[in-house]
Amino acid sequence: MAEFNIDELLKNVLEDPSTEISEETLKQLYQRTNPYKQFKNDSRVAFCSFTNLREQYIRRLIMTSFIGYVFKALQEWMPSYSKPTHTTKTLLSELITLVDTLKQETNDVPSESVVNTILSIADSCKTQTQKSKEAKTTIDSFLREHFVFDPNLHAQSAYTCASTCADTNVDTCASTCASTCASTCASTCASTCASTCASTGASTCADTNVDTCASTCADTNVDTCASTCADTNVDTCASTCADTNVNTCASMCADTNVDTCASTCANTCASTEYTDLADPERIPLHIMQKTLNVPNELQADIDAITQTPQGYRAAAHILQNIELHQSIKHMLENPRAFKPILFNTKITRYLSQHIPPQDTFYKWNYYIEDNYEELRAATESIYPEKPDLEFAFIIYDVVDSSNQQKVDEFYYKYKDQIFSEVSSIQLGNWTLLGSFKANRERYNYFNQNNEIIKRILDRHEEDLKIGKEILRNTIYHKKAKNIQETGPDAPGLSIYNSTFHTDSGIKGLLSFKELKNLEKASGNIKKAREYDFIDDCEEKIKQLLSKENLTPDEESELIKTKKQLNNALEMLNVPDDTIRVDMWVNNNNKLEKEILYTKAEL
């Protein structure tokens, strides 16, 4: 097969567009421009499923970072409906002028013009402040509806820690407790300190430092607490994690620290003193304060250092470690460079306080799916990056995985023709894709821990199942509200939608029967549900009556359905703010049903 020059071929085509190109030349051109090698087609077919978990993670990462940014920007934003009459600078200037004017006044009472000017400035500032508060309240309400889970508004929280804790094994739970629950460990030490002191002995407690008790408990008992967690029944730990309110847990973790728990520990053991094992040469703070002989020029600095145990421990640690002096000096000279590094955990705490509802992910994902082609075209025209989140795959062959020789032969036969990494996939099982050389080890590892994969895939499948139901319920409630406010749809609207909106993304989410019953109930969701149930009962009765001979079970089902239908018809007359109670009264040895209504607590 003769080689050809692409530039020459392109030149000939541009000069004479009618030039015919042979099939062989087109094949060579395709092979030169296509980076993926092709193999001979096979008559066998492999069925497979694939889900892009990497893209799902990136979407969640983007959503999380976006939420943190929006809430932070809201805190720092000062809305401006119009240019403010008084800024801080102009207000200060005017107040200085007023003070000078008051000094020049000869009378004790300031002039009426001065008083009116002050009141005008105060009213202007008050108005601007009130507008700012109202704007922030409105925006905060909007953000919380979309980005903060509320069980009264949303179906499910995006926070999955509880379910993860329930499924995680003992070792994972122990390591998690060890790394994230320092404050909990400290508080646990506080509650058990009395028994520890008792077992240690009164004489030991008397000679031990109170202030160092807390830090010792907080610093030395984390591992003990972790091992205790590891020995604790997993189901109990899981149920506790699942039952604990997530937001409360997050705020507690964010607000509580080891030092706070340390002080609690110190207060609990007020009658005892502990030795700081990490710094045994340091004089206890309360003893040092009794024997201080401080020169006058150092009194202010010493008072500031010894005001809290934390400040005293920090100063003592720096003095005892000469190698820190130069670094501390650099830090004090350039605090802006060190603060973001040493206090970056505050960002994580702030982000963890705003947990979005799962509904937001569903709405966002639905918008992307419904406008996917348009979004791709817009993205490619705006940004230089190409879509790299999609995957293409090719099946080369199917061999017996038990025959390792055939697997190796295939690899060595085509290794020079395949530019990309080769992965082995076992049919009938989910497999995480990896390079051929390391795939066997990774495959064995994930099969030994296949519960990890199962949880990820089960979670993804569960999200897809309930996503449509959440969207359908949202549309159902919005449609009911629309009917209450504006009435039913115009008669020709259904014909228009069927003609022009055949590709609408929400088509089919609400059935014709549901829309009809919503209009029949004037947007009252409670009555619309009753109408749906009545239609189902009537359809079921119609099907049973259409049969010539009913079985005993079908006759019982018919009687039961008729009773349910009658009860549903009666429920239509029950007001929304009341509860119906059926009562049976003995009337001349005959039971008669009476209906009682009681007001519902809304």
UniProtKB/Swiss-Prot annotation:
Source domain of life: Viruses
Start and end residues of each stretch annotated as 28 X 4 AA tandem repeats of [CNG]-[AV]-[DNS]-[MT]: 161-272
Disulfide pairings: none
Induction conditions: Expressed in the late phase of the viral replicative cycle.
Keywords, sorted A to Z: Host cytoplasm, Late protein, Repeat
Sequence repeat placement: 161-164, 165-168, 169-172, 173-176, 177-180, 181-184, 185-188, 189-192, 193-196, 197-200, 201-204, 205-208, 209-212, 213-216, 217-220, 221-224, 225-228, 229-232, 233-236, 237-240, 241-244, 245-248, 249-252, 253-256, 257-260, 261-264, 265-268, 269-272
Compartments it resides in: Host cytoplasm
Entry GO CC: host cell cytoplasm
Similarity annotation: Belongs to the asfivirus B602L family.
Role, per record: Plays an essential role in the assembly of the icosahedral capsid of the virus. Allows the assembly of 3 molecules of hexon protein p72 and formation of a thermostable trimer.
Protein name in the entry: Protein B602L
Organism the protein comes from: African swine fever virus (strain Badajoz 1971 Vero-adapted)
Lineage of the species this protein comes from: Viruses, Varidnaviria, Bamfordvirae, Nucleocytoviricota, Pokkesviricetes
